From Swiss-Prot:
Acetyl-CoA carboxylase is a heterohexamer composed of biotin carboxyl carrier protein (AccB), biotin carboxylase (AccC) and two subunits each of ACCase subunit alpha (AccA) and ACCase subunit beta (AccD). Pathway: Lipid metabolism; malonyl-CoA biosynthesis; malonyl-CoA from acetyl-CoA: step 1/1. The gene is accD. PROSITE patterns: COA_CT_NTER. Its EC number is 2.1.3.15. This is Acetyl-coenzyme A carboxylase carboxyl transferase subunit beta. It is an enzyme of class 2 (transferase). Component of the acetyl coenzyme A carboxylase (ACC) complex. Biotin carboxylase (BC) catalyzes the carboxylation of biotin on its carrier protein (BCCP) and then the CO(2) group is transferred by the transcarboxylase to acetyl-CoA to form malonyl-CoA.
Amino acid sequence: MLKDIFTKKKKYASVPSEQAKHDVPEGIMTKCPKCKKIMLTKELDKNLRVCMNCGHHFPMNAKQRIESLLDEDSFEEFNQGMISENPLGFPEYLEKIEKDREKTSLNEAVVTGKGTISGFPAVIAIMDSTFRMGSMGSVVGEKITLAIEKAKEEKVPFIIFTASGGARMQEGVLSLMQMAKTSSALKLFSEEQGLIISVMTHPTTGGVSASFASLGDYNFAEPGTLIGFAGRRIIEQTIGEKLPEDFQTAEFLLKHGQLDAVIHRNDMKDKLAFLLDMHQTGGEYEWLQD
């Protein structure tokens, strides 16, 4: 009847309380953006932050990268005290830098130092995209240049892992100058027969991809890494064509001759050790080739 419409009890849906939503502590579980599988974060970390289901490579910070590659207690960091200023007086730039320092416990977007990989010495630079998206400013360029000069001085190989959104806009032309400075340092190092190994990780874009990231004697990348200078949309608008779906991926660049290899993270240490062995001893340690 008509009156029943107004007298009938309403049905309500129960909404979880805020407390119930947070019963699982933040960071305990991680969802893979590729296959959507949910896994324990600690298990993901044990697997070098590679999805156990589909092989997707999650980003690594500098500390995780060092622990996965270098021999235990072999890493000696240098120039860690260098910090960015605000030469152009860009609004709120220093405040953003300070927030990233607190969040990451880093002073800048690259960590440099010397260590050993399976006993073979090298100077290594590792960019960290958790700090200002790994953008390249004056300090990043200077630290990388000093690391290259250190490798030249000690006559050991130079290895760099890149992860960057490109030049840091808050430093304007000073950030663009780092492209030339780092490239010049690599040129001088190469003239002294120094070995340069570049490993591009997701993402490596902008001025970083157009300078030191692409200047290795060996240019490698992790699977699925985005590598490029300009964005996909800008390129499509400029050339008036639709680009392939896998355009600007590590696999696409390998197929077109712009990379020497795409290396799974679980194999990275052994592959690097093999190259260091080959260039430093002539390949005495045959076990590395197995």
